[in-house]
């Protein structure tokens, strides 16, 4: 089914409450169906290309007539090379660009929390739009906070990025796998220039702090956060919202910088005006959620780098 914001009444409702609903069309597959799509892609390609799994690439060398892709046990030569390492390969991509002197510029990192609440709170939005991409500009700092990756009747999950445990969310097409909760991320984008340029390093440091304090992901009731107290196992157990992820109860104010947390709290109160119940005491906040972005690599309109035949594509570019 295709969901769209075209002609929706919620655009006006959001604007009336200082929120902005972005235009978007969504065709939902679900995590369970996504596996089938990937299996079909593999089946389509397996007789046409060679796959090498569990084969880390150490470096890429520029040759006179092409490139060498160097792995631990062997090297592959080619006339043209396409690099597509995704967000998880951000550090690797940065190192390769430095070694090959390919120009890059610093990008951003998105930091925030994953919100979990009863599915009924957002059902009027999710039933029509499925995913609401809503942006809010904070009154205090003028920062933009946005909703991201909304999962109606979904589950909150751990995500391992470069050995750091962060939080994410899934949703399913199969009703048997669905839950009574909806979850979504609230993210604040941070950009850096001079003298500090390591946006990803900044995000990693905050995520590592969460791991250090909670042994992984931390969960906190919204009511506890605004009252300046940590959540305890007893308070989580007595909450009217049953968490779908077994996270460590704690205090997110000891992890996230004040400016980011202030913006997230502002956004929750703003969302409460279009989805009453968002700012309930028992709304759960999991932290931290981080979206890493690669250094922006200098490529032309064909996604080719300064080297003829070396292309850098996807989230890795």
Where does each model-flagged region fall?
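Residues forming the flavin
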Residues: 1-317
């Amino acid at each position: 089914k295709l969901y769209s914001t075209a002609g929706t009444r919620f655009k006006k409702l959001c604007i009336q409450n200082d929120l902005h609903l972005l235009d978007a069309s969504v065709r939902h597959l679900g995590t369970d169906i996504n596996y089938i799509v990937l299996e079909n892609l593999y089946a389509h390609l397996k007789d046409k290309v060679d796959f090498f799994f569990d084969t880390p690439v150490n470096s890429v060398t520029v040759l006179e007539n092409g490139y060498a892709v160097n792995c631990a046990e062997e090297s592959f030569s080619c006339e043209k090379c396409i690099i597509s390492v995704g967000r998880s390969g951000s550090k690797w991509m940065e190192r390769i660009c430095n070694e090959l002197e390919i120009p890059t510029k610093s990008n951003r990192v998105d930091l925030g929390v994953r919100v979990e609440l009863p599915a009924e709170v957002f059902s009027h939005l999710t039933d029509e739009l499925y995913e609401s991409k809503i942006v809010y500009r904070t009154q205090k700092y003028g920062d933009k906070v946005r909703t991201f990756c909304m999962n109606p009747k979904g589950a909150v999950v751990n995500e391992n990025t470069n050995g750091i445990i962060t939080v994410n969310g899934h949703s399913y097409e199969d009703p048997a796998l669905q839950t009574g909760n909806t979850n979504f991320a609230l993210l604040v984008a941070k950009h850096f220039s001079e003298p500090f340029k390591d946006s990803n390093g900044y995000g990693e440091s905050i995520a590592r702090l969460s791991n250090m304090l909670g042994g992984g992901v931390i969960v906190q009731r919204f009511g506890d956060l605004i009252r300046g107290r940590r959540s305890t196992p007893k308070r989580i157990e007595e909450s009217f919202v049953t968490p779908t992820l077994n996270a460590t109860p704690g205090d997110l104010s000891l992890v996230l910088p004040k400016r980011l947390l202030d913006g997230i709290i502002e956004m929750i109160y703003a969302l409460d005006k279009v989805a009453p119940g968002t700012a309930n005491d028992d709304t759960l906040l999991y932290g931290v959620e981080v979206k890493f972005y690669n250094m922006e690599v200098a490529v032309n309109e064909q996604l080719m780098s300064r080297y003829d035949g070396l292309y850098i594509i996807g989230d890795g570019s």
